[in-house]
Amino acid sequence: SKMDSSVRLLVLINPNNPCGSVAGAEEIEQLLSIARKWPNCMIVADEIYDGLDFTGTQRSVASLSTDVPVFTLNGVSKVYYAPGWRIGYLAIHDPTHRMLNVRDGIERMLRARLCASTPAQFGYLAGLESDRSWMLGYSEKVIRQRDVCIKRISQIEGLEVQSSGGAFYMFVRLTDAKWAEDDKQFVLDLLHEEHVLVVHGSGFSPKLGK
């Protein structure tokens, strides 16, 4: 209902940060059908958590699009657990060549030659081309940690949480009226009293994040 000709892009983070939800093929097709109605609209697909999909339903948006331009973002910081390498990439999928001007603008920016170190780039290439079965062990570890967190949080009165389908996040709802009144203060109290650091939900959405 909020779509009109002024909208230039739709953003999908899949698996999602901060909720940990995963959009499957059906949801992605719905998003594509919305973008398809507006010729000047493209999709930016942040898929940096694609290797941490616990549902088996995550799909690349570009692989499902036959006409809508999709700019896919990915990198090493999440799935490869190497944030210090500072390596990411953008893959452009533009079947009908509608975003040539945007692509040209990006290529002009690349000429500034600001990039990650060459050894790190070759290291990432080796990671992409070699056996990645080791990732399964890391994924299983994250799942075990998720399950422990869900079990413990569900035992605390005043907190609610849904099981995350991917990434390493969960969005905990404050159901206690006192806590929910000021989630920033809750975060500070939790840090000072229990030495546990979390992020306040209202930072993502003042209205929906509490």
Summary of predicted features, one role per range:
Residues S1-S5, R108, G158, V198, ...:
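Short, intrinsically disordered, charge-balanced linker/junction segments flanking boundaries
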Residues T66-I143, I150-R152:
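Conserved core segment of the aminotransferase class I/II
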Residues F186:
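Short active-site alpha-helical segment characteristic of glycosyltransferases
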